[in-house]
């Protein structure tokens, strides 16, 4: 996938898109949601702003949530990105981390660290 604009990363919305979250993502061309969406209206609201790629988290249940995978791998402008909700699931769900970036959420704590050339990034919680 090729984009010309910014990539926004959001997680743990738990059914809400706060105004400050929408504002922070306003100029993004692509939004990556790393789980705990909460309800489908969250993705609908974000899709009104940009293209959205989302995965489900541990609070995402019901038929609507089945539309979202547990993990997602994508390449954006040559950058290989893997998405998983819980950091502790990375060894199991992403055993072959042949990527440039691993995005995750769940802990509600922002995290950014580069290890062996791979960026591990958690945006923190955007919800209640």
Where do the protein language model's features map onto the residues?
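N-terminal active-site segment of His-dependent metallophosphoesterases
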Residues: 1-52, 60-70, 78-80
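Active-site metal-binding loops of divalent metal-dependent hydrolases
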Residues: 11-15, 35-37, 57-60, 86-88, ...
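Conserved beta-sheet core of the metallophosphoesterase superfamily
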Residues: 53, 80-82, 87-128
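Residue-level detector of beta-strand structural context in well-folded domains
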Residues: 70-72, 110
């Amino acid at each position: 996938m090729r984009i010309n604009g910014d990539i926004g990363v959001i997680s743990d919305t738990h059914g809400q898109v706060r105004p400050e979250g929408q504002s922070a993502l306003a100029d993004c061309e692509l939004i990556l949601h790393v789980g705990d969406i909460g309800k489908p209206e969250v993705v609908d609201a974000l899709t009104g702003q940009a293209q959205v790629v989302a995965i489900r988290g541990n609070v995402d249940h019901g038929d609507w949530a089945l539309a979202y995978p547990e993990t997602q791998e994508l390449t954006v402008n040559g950058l290989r990105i893997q998405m998983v909700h819980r950091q502790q699931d990375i060894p199991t769900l992403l055993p072959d981390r042949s990527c440039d970036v691993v995005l995750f959420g769940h802990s509600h704590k922002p995290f950014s660290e580069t290890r062996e050339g791979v960026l591990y990034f958690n945006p923190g919680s955007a919800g209640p």
